Structure formats: C-alpha cells, structure tokens
C-alpha cells in the first residue's frame, strides 16, 4: 500500500469487567472496525485509506473512539452505523461528522 491519504485508528482496548474506566472493546469496537472495513471495501478505498486497531486513545468513558489522521480528528460514542457517514462526509467530503466529534472537555 502506498502512503494512505487518511489513517483511521479504532480503539480496541479491553479491560476487565468492572474496571472504572471501561473500555472501547466492551463498547462495540469490533463491530465499529468491521463496519469501517466493509465501507472501505464497498467503496474501493482500501488502497487510499488505512484502517488499524489500536490501544487506548484516552476518553474511555466515550467509547468506542475513532481517531483519524491527518488532522487528529477524534470521534466518540461511535457505532457501526456511523462508519459510512464518517467515510462519506469526512474522508470523501472534507467535513467532519459533527454529531460524533469528541467534545474538547474530554480530549
């Protein structure tokens, strides 16, 4: 793969049940990753946009979290249905998806 135009990082951190910070893994990160992967495949974008799981991105209380570079744009409370919107609106359209942007007070 050549240098990607965008890189999507999906937090997939897991912690034990009852951990005070929770985890994106327990908040559906696997489904979010799979949804992004399917959108990239369907739109033939896998050669332009990299998709990677990562450890903790910080705002665990707001998971599942997604971080996109360039621009360091963080999305929180992301659900699988948001993947298509984020790809279409942000990555292809150039406008971040305001409904899921991580609030400044937590990141």
UniProtKB/Swiss-Prot annotation:
<comment type="similarity">
    <text>Belongs to the 2Fe2S Shethna-type ferredoxin family.</text>
</comment>
<keyword id="KW-0001">2Fe-2S</keyword>
<feature type="binding site">
    <location>
        <position position="11"/>
    </location>
    <ligand>
        <name>[2Fe-2S] cluster</name>
    </ligand>
</feature>
<keyword id="KW-0411">Iron-sulfur</keyword>
<keyword id="KW-0249">Electron transport</keyword>
<dbReference type="InterPro" id="IPR048111">
    <property type="entry name" value="Fdxn_Azotob-type"/>
</dbReference>
<comment type="function">
    <text>Ferredoxins are iron-sulfur proteins that transfer electrons in a wide variety of metabolic reactions. Might be involved in nitrogen fixation.</text>
</comment>
<feature type="binding site">
    <location>
        <position position="60"/>
    </location>
    <ligand>
        <name>[2Fe-2S] cluster</name>
    </ligand>
</feature>
<keyword id="KW-0479">Metal-binding</keyword>
<keyword id="KW-0535">Nitrogen fixation</keyword>
<keyword id="KW-0813">Transport</keyword>
<feature type="binding site">
    <location>
        <position position="24"/>
    </location>
    <ligand>
        <name>[2Fe-2S] cluster</name>
    </ligand>
</feature>
<dbReference type="GO" id="GO:0009399">
    <property type="term" value="P:nitrogen fixation"/>
</dbReference>
<dbReference type="GO" id="GO:0046872">
    <property type="term" value="F:metal ion binding"/>
</dbReference>
<feature type="binding site">
    <location>
        <position position="56"/>
    </location>
    <ligand>
        <name>[2Fe-2S] cluster</name>
    </ligand>
</feature>
<keyword id="KW-0408">Iron</keyword>
<comment type="subunit">
    <text>Homodimer.</text>
</comment>
<dbReference type="GO" id="GO:0051537">
    <property type="term" value="F:2 iron, 2 sulfur cluster binding"/>
</dbReference>
<dbReference type="InterPro" id="IPR036249">
    <property type="entry name" value="Thioredoxin-like_sf"/>
</dbReference>
<protein>
    <recommendedName>
        <fullName>Ferredoxin, 2Fe-2s</fullName>
    </recommendedName>
</protein>
């Amino acid at each position: 793969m050549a240098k990607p135009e965008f890189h999507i990082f999906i937090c997939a951190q897991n912690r034990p049940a009852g951990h005070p910070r929770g985890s994106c893994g327990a908040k559906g990160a696997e489904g979010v990753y799979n949804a992004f992967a399917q959108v990239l495949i369907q739109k033939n974008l896998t050669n332009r946009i990299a998709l990677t799981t990562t450890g903790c991105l910080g705002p665990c209380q707001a998971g599942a979290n997604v971080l996109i570079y360039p621009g360091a744009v963080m999305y929180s409370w992301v659900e699988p249905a948001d993947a298509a919107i984020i790809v279409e609106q942000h990555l292809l359209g150039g406008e971040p998806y305001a409904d899921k942007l991580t609030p400044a007070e937590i990141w």
